[in-house]
Amino acid sequence: MTAKFVVRGGNRLSGTVTIGGAKNSALPIVTAAALAAEGESILENVPDNSDIQHLCEILRALGCRVERVAETTLRIQARELEHHVAPYHLARRLRGSTYVMGLLLARLGKGEVACPGGCEIGARPVDFHLKGFRALGAEVVVEHGAMVSRRVDLRGGRFYVDRASVGTTVNMIITASLAPGVTVLENAACEPEIVDLANFINAMGGRVRGAGTNTVRIEGVDRLRGARHEIIPDRIEAGTYMMMTAAAGGDVVVENVIPEHLGTVIAKLVEAGQEVEEHGDCIRVRARPIRAVDVETQVYPGFPTDLQSPWVALMGLADGISVVHETIFENRFGFTNELIRMGAKIKVDRNTGIIRGVKRYTGAPVEARDIRGGAALVTAALAAEGVTEVSGVQYIDRGYTRMEEKLAALGADIRRVPNGSEQ
């Protein structure tokens, strides 16, 4: 049954929130665990959000054994991976389904995977991935909404990653890990999640060098074996709770983080007038009056596109006018129509939002249509006067584990209720 959040705004947040494992690391790493034809992998700090659940279902359907042996621990054994067609009804629900294609090409030399579904934030074309597969000797075409392999003769190659795409970089590392010869990726993404993936593959016996730089070198090996690995903390989840604290007001410690992964976000929050302190693996945010600050999303280490939406919600309460320019995805301002229902003053011109701050938001029924836009609506709801009902919670669940429980523990008045129920 679909659900909604009912949020009564106005409560200040206080306490400590623990950040889970990075979804954007877990998706490729859980997929890469199935590259191992020997042994089993134990993955720790794995978030239990719906995207990870869907991926585990896909791997089971392909013949892998996947068990959640503890709240944040997965055991994966892929010796019996033998099916090359990912079930359509599962793959279409997952943006990371393209990684499964790379896995199948590497392990089985053939594959058929539905083109990715997920959030309504514009096109995420598979063309970059298809070009990468072609550079490694695999001809993959799109037919009837699915990626289908035709001729596959995997071998190392040199490939330029358009727009420093994170997804394409991930997929090329996965595919090239078992491809004979050496693969060189130029203009590769540098995100911490790329480094995390490379560390795991190397622990399995792979040979990935240069992760975290623009040039990544992968020397293919004959076989990989299972390994133990702890996934890095989710910098996007951490940044979201930091912005929620600034918007709602309060004093919150965000724990289990790597502060250097959030350098740009911390700098922008400080520029916006917030008090931010780093203590080991914790970041403390004390809310202060919000100043308007311009932001342009960029690849890492720039301001993350996945935090653009919560930032817009925060800037909607700032003193002054701010400009937010989105350079990674088109159509990522769709959520602003819902913020406007809550009293925000935002004008969008293609990939730029101009935000004139207001003193407060007012509660209203709103609908989330993507993960981060949903987080932005909750951010606004926490700071709003009155009650806000946020439907489309299934999108939020794709990227955040038990958000309502974590916020309630900080003092927020937030409940998850079935859609259609009377309040």
UniProtKB/Swiss-Prot annotation:
E.C. designation(s): 2.5.1.7
Reaction(s) catalysed by this chain's protein: phosphoenolpyruvate + UDP-N-acetyl-alpha-D-glucosamine = UDP-N-acetyl-3-O-(1-carboxyvinyl)-alpha-D-glucosamine + phosphate
Positions contributing to UDP-N-acetyl-alpha-D-glucosamine binding: R95, D306, I328
Keywords, sorted A to Z: Cell cycle, Cell division, Cell shape, Cell wall biogenesis/degradation, Cytoplasm, Peptidoglycan synthesis, Pyruvate, Transferase
EC top class, as a word: transferase
Pathway(s) the chain acts in: Cell wall biogenesis; peptidoglycan biosynthesis
InterPro entries, sorted: Enolpyruvate_Tfrase_dom, Enolpyruvate_Tfrase_sf, MurA_subfamily, RNA3'P_cycl/enolpyr_Trfase_a/b, UDP_GlcNAc_COvinyl_MurA
Pfam families assigned: EPSP_synthase
Modified residues (2-(S-cysteinyl)pyruvic acid O-phosphothioketal): C119
GO biological process: cell division; cell wall organization; peptidoglycan biosynthetic process; regulation of cell shape; UDP-N-acetylgalactosamine biosynthetic process
GO cellular component, one term: cytoplasm
Coiled coil: none
Record-listed phosphoenolpyruvate binding positions: K23, N24
Listed GO MF terms: UDP-N-acetylglucosamine 1-carboxyvinyltransferase activity
Function, in words: Cell wall formation. Adds enolpyruvyl to UDP-N-acetylglucosamine.
HAMAP family (UniProt xref): MurA
Family: Belongs to the EPSP synthase family. MurA subfamily.
PANTHER family referenced in this protein's UniProt entry, alphabetically: UDP-N-ACETYLGLUCOSAMINE 1-CARBOXYVINYLTRANSFERASE
Protein name (record): UDP-N-acetylglucosamine 1-carboxyvinyltransferase 2
Naturally occurring in which organism (per UniProt): Symbiobacterium thermophilum (strain DSM 24528 / JCM 14929 / IAM 14863 / T)
Gene: murA2
